[in-house]
Amino acid sequence: MRHRCRVKKLSKPADQRRALLRSLTTELIRHGKITTTLIRAKVLRSEVEKMITLAKNGSLAARREALGYIFDKQLVHALFEQVPTRYGDRQGGYTRILHTVPRRGDNAKMAIIELV
């Protein structure tokens, strides 16, 4: 039974799931918009919002936490410079998920996740 199970497992072990979410988060912050499956987009939303909230905080501890999660150091630097001006007045809801056509090979539900 699935009672009180809070983590979407994405059919992967914990270390692979963590690596997948780190890479998807890095690419979404780098490009601003990516196409992925709907479930991955929904799980990715919470991770990206955490990183943007850290960047809004702007402290040294928040920067170090972001550096431990996002792969690219220059990307973290750019994130911490741009986010306070871009999302300064917004209290959450930094991403948007748009449903698209299913994937051709296996008919998986696809979505575009983008930064607002």
Curated annotation (Swiss-Prot):
Tell me where on the tree of life, at the top rank, the source sits: Bacteria
Q: Name one GO cellular component term.
A: cytosolic large ribosomal subunit
GO MF annotations, alphabetized: structural constituent of ribosome
GO terms, biological process: translation
- The answer on whether this UniProt entry bears the keyword Ribosomal protein reads yes
Q: Per the record's keyword annotation, is Ribosomal protein included, yes or no?
A: yes
Which keywords does the record carry? Ribonucleoprotein, Ribosomal protein
Family matches, as Gene3D superfamilies: Ribosomal protein L17 (3.90.1030.10)
| Family the UniProt entry places it in | Belongs to the bacterial ribosomal protein bL17 family.
Which PANTHER family does this UniProt record tie to the protein? LARGE RIBOSOMAL SUBUNIT PROTEIN BL17M, RIBOSOMAL PROTEIN L17
Quaternary structure and interacting proteins, as annotated? Part of the 50S ribosomal subunit. Contacts protein L32.
Q: Which NCBIfam families match?
A: L17 (TIGR00059)
Designated name of the protein: Large ribosomal subunit protein bL17
Organism of origin: Nostoc punctiforme (strain ATCC 29133 / PCC 73102)
Q: Which gene encodes it?
A: rplQ
